[in-house]
Amino acid sequence: MEELVGLREGFSGDPVTLQELWGPCPHIRRAIQGGLEWLKQKVFRLGEDWYFLMTLGVLMALVSYAMNFAIGCVVRAHQWLYREIGDSHLLRYLSWTVYPVALVSFSSGFSQSITPSSGGSGIPELKTMLAGVILEDYLDIKNFGAKVVGLSCTLATGSTLFLGKVGPFVHLSVMIAAYLGRVRTTTIGEPENKSKQNEMLVAAAAVGVATVFAAPFSGVLFSIEVMSSHFSVRDYWRGFFAATCGAFIFRLLAVFNSEQETITSLYKTSFRVDVPFDLPEIFFFVALGGICGVLSCAYLFCQRTFLSFIKTNRYSSKLLATSKPVYSALATLLLASITYPPGVGHFLASRLSMKQHLDSLFDNHSWALMTQNSSPPWPEELDPQHLWWEWYHPRFTIFGTLAFFLVMKFWMLILATTIPMPAGYFMPIFILGAAIGRLLGEALAVAFPEGIVTGGVTNPIMPGGYALAGAAAFSGAVTHTISTALLAFELTGQIVHALPVLMAVLAANAIAQSCQPSFYDGTIIVKKLPYLPRILGRNIGSHHVRVEHFMNHSITTLAKDTPLEEVVKVVTSTDVTEYPLVESTESQILVGIVQRAQLVQALQAEPPSRAPGHQQCLQDILARGCPTEPVTLTLFSETTLHQAQNLFKLLNLQSLFVTSRGRAVGCVSWVEMKKAISNLTNPPAPK
């Protein structure tokens, strides 16, 4: 009935459907429909991304603030329970441990029951996807709810697990961007553009960082450094615009909720502006960078080794395969027991939240000098005005608690990374770096109590500046990024230590990048995700290794003059996704590519003719409409390994055919590239 059309009685106009003819107010309905069509064309104008990026930033800011609000309520409820439960050590211990155990067990079980890809940080998988690998359902919108709920429960455990939300928020932002992109393409009816989709995903990663730290500049640079090996400068504006929208709304919500008087940085500092550091201190900042680089190598090696052990050990692997919540509960119980404040947690400042950890470590006064003549009390309740008291113990001193904190959190964080739940690992690493810098700064303050004399003027040493440099250097070394220096400035709102912090970050990266893969690359290796390693150094001979030395020679070509019987045999006996199409069996000149699925469909739709004296060949199938793809890019047999690797990374390629004088002679994929690079960096032993 709805397909029938007619004319209104006494009306000579365009035909209308019966449903419209009988519907109420047809003129108003047509006007509204026309207005919506006009609005759709304006909002979703082809090539216009402003609305998309602004929507992405605003949505992620709302999600981030709502999560922080909900997490804050749960954390305050836990603190209230711990305070009001009484003086019984058993009840206090149970309230401190059972609460996070229940939250983590629910987080692990809930997220894993919906989709296993919602666990962990999410950045390693995103790096793999942006490199051109397709991971099924990883950006599905159902993962969004699982990750939000699981991450909220993880962060609600407070300082017992000591985890952050940067990585998961990058994943959440990318999922929202992918969903909005699908809505956009469906609404305007344009075909999906893979290149543009990747550009939007990198911009979404910047939004994820910006809505956590309210740091748009470092968010953009960090996402570029972590997510992609090559980035087009013309796409900068997308990341900056979306990240600025997200960071602005995120901080504006805090002002509207009376949490802040105006839009300011997250972590307040009071560093001297006139003379923040003396010139000789540059040497100590560079030395701090070297220390952070060495410690980051140790951390990366231990973390990757322990994660591999957990995945391969007979007992832990079986527990993770069958009862992930049980493994999560056991690991959380151990970590929560260690951080119990009346016990070992007394020496770990475990009553401080992660924000309070950074607020105290960035203090510009020297705790060691302040405790030389007097011992501050350890209060029954946390004193927000004297957070540094949590770091002091009369027997351990400031140096003992800082060193103990570093040693314990070093392995506790490694253990926490094995728990299968949504969690971020950047913020704990940032705090560990701040503790390393604070320890060195306190040692220098004791060694030079009056400061270092330069030009007859003495200025006391500020340990908080070293904590800032250590946080940027250690986190930058672990993630192989330089933008952590800018992140430190945006977090604190001060740039007085710009040069020493940047020098420390560069020194740490120089050591870490030459010795270990980054935290995210190491996770990719352990999870056995598709991964194309970098070629490090100039003297390993990558310019002398040619494609013909490592390419796959056994390729199956289809010539235009191949009989259909042979084509059917090739299709049924191989499982490749595409075949190189050559001009003839004799010449082997590469002229195109035929997709296997389309070729099978064409063969099924057009059965071979049984006319006598006529033998059908592949050319007949192609002439009837079987689509072929032009060969836009190939490798020459004389192409070097270095050039091939750069080409694969630049264009996010998975495989390329190799030609010699136009003839198809082989193909190169990630498998051959990885094997060639591995043989180059670690030559096999001579037989």
Curated annotation (Swiss-Prot):
Stretches of the chain found on the membrane's Cytoplasmic side: 507-687
CDD domains: CBS_pair_voltage-gated_CLC_euk_bac, ClC_1_like
A GO term, aspect molecular function: metal ion binding
Domain of life of the organism encoding this protein: Eukaryota
Disulfide bonds, paired cysteine numbers: none
One of the GO biological process terms: transepithelial chloride transport
Effect listed in the UniProt record for changing E259N: Ca(2+)-insensitive
TM segment ranges: 52-72, 161-181, 202-222, 236-256, 282-302, 329-349, 396-416, 417-437, 452-472, 486-506
Residues bound to Ca(2+): E259, E261, D278, E281
Subcellular localization: Basolateral cell membrane
UniProt keywords, alphabetically: Bartter syndrome, Calcium, CBS domain, Cell membrane, Chloride, Chloride channel, Deafness, Disease variant, Ion channel, Ion transport, Membrane, Metal-binding, Repeat, Transmembrane, Transmembrane helix, Transport
Main location: membrane
Domain CBS residues, every copy: 551-609, 626-684
Subunit structure: Homodimer. Interacts with BSND.
PANTHER family, sorted: CHLORIDE CHANNEL PROTEIN 2, CHLORIDE CHANNEL PROTEIN CLC-KA
The family this protein is said to belong to: Belongs to the chloride channel (TC 2.A.49) family. CLCNKA subfamily.
Protein name: Chloride channel protein ClC-Ka
Organism: Homo sapiens (Human)
UniProt lineage: Eukaryota, Metazoa, Chordata, Craniata, Vertebrata
